[in-house]
Amino acid sequence: MADTQTLLQNFGQVYDNPVLLDRSVTAPVTEGLNVLLASFQALYLQYQKHHFVVEGAEFYSLHEFFNSSYNEVQDHVHEIGERLNGLGGVPAASFSKLAELTCFEQESDGVYSSRKMVENDLAAEQAIINVIRRQAAQAESLGDRGTRYLYEKILLKTEERAYHLAHFLAKDSLTLGFVQPAQN
């Protein structure tokens, strides 16, 4: 017996939705949701890799931070995917589509210093913050208050991770004394 696949809805195609938002609203909103979904998927993989490979004096605190961050980011992906589907859209899922839609420069494969990993994560979070702010304003202007509210909840968590990453990069650190000569 031959295996057949029947495509029910193309990516980018938006169907009617049970929350009664017009397609003129949901089409641009679902497009923005997919940019964030892709970006959080890429960030999830980056945080997960950092969790696996981090070493050095800050190992334990960074190891735990990367773990909690990739779990939070995974939750964002879930919420965004559910919202996309609820609005009649199709969540991006192929690696090629996710890479195309991601809003930040993805870190190349390899292992980097702890500082560089944190810098890359902060740059990614900041790029995502900018997209969330734009998309929240767009959703509000189109009358999609539910998506705007979802964006605002995610924005607060994303900003909090950015604060923590910036704190890891602070110049005042016990470990700097181990690797830099004392200045008298």
UniProtKB/Swiss-Prot annotation:
It comes from the Bacteria. PROSITE patterns: DPS_2. Hexamer. It comes from Nostoc sp. (strain PCC 7120 / SAG 25.82 / UTEX 2576). It holds the Pfam family Ferritin. The lineage of its organism: Bacteria, Bacillati, Cyanobacteriota, Cyanophyceae, Nostocales. Involved in protection of chromosomal DNA from damage under nutrient-limited and oxidative stress conditions. Binds heme. This is Nutrient stress-induced DNA-binding protein. The keyword Heme applies. One of its GO terms (molecular function) is DNA binding. CDD domains: DPS. Keywords: DNA-binding, Heme, Iron, Metal-binding. Belongs to the Dps family.
